[in-house]
Amino acid sequence: MNKRYLLLIILVLVASVLVNANTAPKQTQKETQMSDEIFITNENVNKVIDSLSKSIPEANLFRIERGAQQVASLWRKQDGTAQEYEAFCIENFVADNESLSQLFNKLERNFEIFNGYFHKIDLKLKEPLQLDGPAIQPIDMMFGGYDVSAHLNDDMYSSKIAFITALNFPFYSLDEKTELGNDWTRQEWAFARMGDRFISRVPAHLQQHISRTLTNADAYISDYNIYMGQLLNEEGDKLFPEDMKLITHWGLRDELKSNYADTENGLEKQRMVYKVMQRIVDQTIPQQVINDGTYEWDLENNKIYAEGKEVSATPELDKRYEVFLGNFHAMKQLDPYSTHYPTQLDRAFDGTMEVPKKDVEKLFTDLLSSPMVKEVAAFIESRLGRPLEPFDIWYNGFKSGGGVPEEELSAMTSKKYPNAGALEADLPRMLHELGWTKEKANEITSLITVDASRGAGHAWGASMRNDKAHLRTRIGENGMDYKGYNIAVHEFGHNVEQTITLNDVDYYMLSGVPNTSFTEAIAFLFQKRDLDLLGLKQTNPHDDYYLALDNFWSSFEIMGVSLVDIQVWEWMYANPDATPKQLKEAVMSIAKGVWNTYYADVLGGKDESLLGIYSHMIDYPLYLPNYPMGHLIDFQIEQQVKDKNMANEIERMLTQGSIIPQLWMKGAVGQEISIDPLLNATKEALDALR
């Protein structure tokens, strides 16, 4: 992913930014609310429709009606009188197809220019926050939180560009796209995406506030590191390397996974990581051990020591949930301006994912309730030779080469990739080994650059053709360890998708993929081949079986986490005045409820709150459901590319661009997103392996 972090050294700054964001613009907000009222009446709209209908062929009636209504919903008093609204619509409606295509081409070209260059500015301003380097200073936060494009939409409206776009390119709901889209030409799809461009009018000051809030959340998580070498077990021993510093939750999770290969201390280390996670979720973690290696931390008794002497520990209390709540309040402010998608949940599912929430939840609950869960759990238990524990939700023993100790893998990767430049130089080879021709591999990777990341790593695609995508990855002083390499291969998959769908899709308005689940699916395809790219490919006739089991267990893990995320957002909407403490209690209660319903019978740990550990909940509002959707899509794509050239198949699929997900899937694999292929393959795998 993209994404995507704690910044204790500037807590005072963060607080002041939030206070300023909430207090300074009060008068502006009041004035904006007054001027943001819709005042164009149905009578005005009907006048436009009647006037245009008399002079324009009937075939355009739908566009006339939809366009006049859409402009009316966006027109404000500062844009002109009701009579000026009517005159604008009548004068600027484009009826003939040739002129409409010319208008589209000009809009598309110029929107790419805006998107591309504003993106480059944003990327450069955030470098001090996201790239490895000197300590972050208050001025870095100020620039990093600045949204350079915040006033662009205002300018689009004041210049009337937004109105001419909304007038001539109608907005289609998800239901309408689903019903009509199968028969649309590529140009008609591009026109429909142009119609998505102006459907809400958000004030610039609000966009700036949201940008600052999300930047602060990103900074909070980016520096939420745990110094593992300072952890003490019940006997007072240290089991982790002295220099091991892991980001929450990604690094902790991956360390837990890696210890399945450690037959000596692996289980005890896993239980220690698990305890760290629990203390983060319930906020009993001492403030002093977050991003600070000064203190030894007795996990079981929650005591800290400096130079052998106990020091008073101060729990983090509810900071984690204060940040989470800040995201909710920021995103909720968009609700009044989003007529088509009136809540963040609507925007996340119908608007961004373009799969209805009820359909997503049904996919998740159907898999979580499947009889396959207990059967796969029993199979894992037989392999481990012990009863399963809650942290076995991250069991990764199905992966090819999973028995190779991580120390050996890290020795290979640190030697191969001592710095970001070494990884960047190796990208063409990696892509060629995955099936691309040398020429195409060089073409794609020439548009990808590698940066040393401050956080766990992410992929940041370009926004205009022939600009570079950025692969951000964590590289230590001694080179890239295996955890960093594994994440980097995942992010490389994102970058390849970003580059192909920007540069090889026929219309800029169709660039990208239907939603982030699809880029996650491509990233998973790459990530699971990370050992192949190290030359460790082992031909195993059971590989396909283990692939199915691995995907099933990964889906089982992240679907529950996603349900927690969804239910927490539903709870926040039902309790908008909640305090951070109340939110913490709600998150833990919801996490326990989901756990008891779907996990406790197979993993134990009744009333377990582990599902609340994911940093995405704090950092990326409602992003988590994209991961399990990505797993399902990934599995269906994996089956499609089996015994075929992976590069050719990926190119074929990706060049469909950003049509809606279910139509994309039909074009890619011949059926919609479904759990059935995964369940069938899982059953086949168990029958073969038991």
Regions found by a protein language model. Give the residues of each.
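Positively charged n-region of N-terminal signal peptides that target proteins for export
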Residues: 1-5
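Post-HExxH zinc-binding segment in Zn-dependent metallohydrolases
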Residues: 500-504, 508-551, 630, 670
